[in-house]
């Protein structure tokens, strides 16, 4: 149960006043970083700006309080933008809330079932493919607001989106582009000046002031979304229906997988920064509770945010108190300063997300991976990338996982091999080789199996053949780590053929897992326990004695 115990309860022992001050200061700084990102990501996801803050406040609190990392900062992230936009377009806000709650439940179940370590089995090529796909989709999604295009709602499909931009390209607002360019310049250059204050906050303050005081014709959050609510999020139970749950189970599962991958990756990165070890299963439960309550209080899916978590560590945060302080600070901003957020130019938020999208993708690494990775990995990478861009994230991950599994099984099947031993007197055996070989009679055939024997490789067993002189077949299995039911069926077929030909089967060096499967299948009873020997020397001695005994009986 200690694995499920929240990290907060562990780190409070010996907690000092000095660390409390550091955590509070770090939490305030991280809240300032999270503010523009939460608003921008919510808008990019197709929901209202305040829902981004609701998510950072509610989900962030539960992730910090119940999670398995000391310094994790939870909230909305760019990874969810694509899937959230698709859900909102198809099912509306209530559908998104249902999917978020379902994803939270799935994450809690994963944590309770100790699935934290299983996330590592998601191939790197899949996570890379959909991450770069998300980056492209997020980047393209900001073109309307960055250029100030006068058009209706942006289509959710990638090709339709590009078509809509092309059709409305003549409506570009030069003033909007200029303000967006100013924001971009600040975002790019500010980190070189100082990392104490986030460039996104400076860009928002500067461009908002320019637009407001110069009364420039630029769309702002207020002009697009109206007056923003400064009320604290209220509890809302969405209407569940069997049909809706059935339709949303796949998107919810995708959200859960994404949240699990990103949060545990963030936890691993922060572990390296502070020299700690997170609890993966407790972290999944914290993420699950965060998403459940985020949905119930009007938020969107959330996970551990790597950039915000790293900022927390760099500013002295070392316990979940920093994450909780970040939530409290955002709550105060929501109540006191939210009306001012309506003045923020939409092009500035688009610029913030353009930089986020650019930072998500290191294209040099992407093309290097395409050039150097094995062909099967490249297929998975490219397929996941293009499916994310041209279809959606749900399809991309489903196809990516299935494709990766099939290609992995193909690789494993190709490693499985059955090799027949040569006899010392065969013409192609050199004298030097013959000296090292054991001289066995031609009535004994030896086959060595290598690699895992599973359904894709079970046919290799069919290559075990005999001739009229064969009395005994010795099967050496020291290089077989595992077998499955399909392989057992093939072994039973081999045993049946051998019995018809009055050939005895002897097995040498059967490893633990194959032996366990054979016992469970009663295969050992079928063959005879005495025909299973611990090594090849004893197996050959046993086979030669059998042949010799049968020869003596025939002579009599």
Regions found by a protein language model. Give the residues of each.
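Short secondary-structure boundary/hinge segments and terminal tails
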Residues: 289, 330, 516, 535-536
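Intrinsically disordered, low-complexity cytosolic terminal tails
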Residues: 554-556
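The feature marks cytosolic C-terminal regulatory regions of anion transporters and related permeases
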Residues: 359-526, 544-552
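Active-site-adjacent beta-strand anchor residues
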Residues: 74, 507-508, 533
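Transmembrane helical cores of multi-pass ion-transport proteins
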Residues: 1-425, 490
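Short acidic-hydrophobic, aromatic-tinged amphipathic segments that line or gate anion-handling sites
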Residues: 526-542
């Amino acid at each position: 149960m200690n694995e499920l115990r929240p990290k907060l309860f562990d780190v409070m022992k010996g907690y000092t006043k000095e660390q409390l001050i550091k955590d509070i200061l770090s939490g305030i700084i991280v809240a300032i970083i999270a503010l523009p990102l939460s608003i921008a990501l919510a808008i990019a996801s197709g929901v209202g700006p305040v829902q981004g803050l609701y998510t950072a406040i509610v989900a962030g609190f539960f992730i910090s309080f119940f999670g398995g990392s000391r310094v994790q900062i939870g909230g909305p992230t760019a990874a969810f933008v694509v899937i959230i936009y698709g859900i909102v377009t198809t099912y509306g806000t209530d559908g998104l809330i249902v999917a978020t709650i379902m994803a939270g439940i799935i994450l809690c179940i994963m944590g309770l079932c100790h699935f934290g370590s299983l996330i590592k089995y998601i191939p790197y090529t899949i996570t890379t493919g959909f991450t770069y796909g998300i980056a492209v989709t997020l980047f393209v999604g900001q073109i309307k607001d960055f250029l100030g295009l006068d058009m209706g709602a942006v289509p959710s499909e990638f090709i339709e989106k590009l078509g809509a931009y092309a059709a409305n390209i003549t409506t570009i607002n030069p003033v909007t582009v200029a303000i967006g360019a100013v924001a971009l310049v600040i975002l790019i250059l500010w980190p070189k000046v100082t990392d104490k204050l986030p460039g996104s906050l400076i860009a928002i303050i500067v461009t908002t002031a320019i637009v407001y005081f110069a009364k420039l014709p630029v769309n702002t959050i207020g002009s697009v979304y109206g007056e923003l609510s400064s009320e604290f999020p209220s509890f809302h139970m969405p209407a569940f229906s069997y049909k809706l749950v059935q339709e949303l189970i796949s998107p919810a599962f995708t959200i859960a997988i994404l949240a699990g991958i990103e949060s545990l990756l963030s936890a691993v990165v922060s572990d390296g920064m502070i020299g700690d070890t997170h609890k993966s299963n407790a972290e999944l439960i914290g993420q699950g509770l965060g998403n459940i309550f985020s949905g119930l209080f009007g938020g969107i899916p959330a996970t551990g945010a790597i950039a915000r978590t790293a900022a927390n560590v760099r500013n002295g945060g070392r316990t979940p108190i920093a994450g909780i302080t970040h939530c409290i600070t955002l709550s105060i901003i929501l109540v006191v300063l939210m009306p001012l957020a309506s003045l923020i130019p939409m092009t500035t938020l688009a610029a913030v997300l353009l930089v986020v999208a650019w930072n998500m993708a290191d294209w040099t690494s992407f093309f290097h991976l395409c050039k150097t990775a094995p062909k099967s990995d490249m297929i998975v990478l490219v397929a996941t990338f293009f499916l994310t861009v041209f279809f959606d994230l749900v399809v991309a991950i489903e196809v990516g996982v299935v494709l990766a599994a099939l290609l992995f099984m193909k690789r494993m099947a190709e490693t499985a091999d059955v090799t027949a031993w040569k006899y010392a007197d065969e013409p192609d055996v050199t004298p030097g080789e013959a000296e090292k070989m054991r001289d066995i009679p031609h009535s004994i055939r030896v086959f060595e199996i290598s690699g895992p024997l599973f359904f894709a490789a079970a046919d290799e067993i069919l290559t075990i053949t005999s001739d009229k002189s064969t009395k005994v077949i010795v099967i050496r299995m020291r290089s077989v780590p595992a077998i499955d039911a399909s392989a057992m069926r093939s072994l039973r077929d081999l045993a049946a053929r051998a019995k018809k030909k009055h050939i005895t089967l002897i097995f040498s060096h059967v490893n633990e897992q194959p032996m366990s499967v054979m016992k469970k299948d009663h295969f050992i009873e079928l063959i005879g326990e005495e025909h299973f020997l611990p090594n090849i020397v004893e197996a050959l001695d046993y086979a030669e004695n059998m042949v010799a005994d049968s020869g003596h009986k025939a002579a009599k």
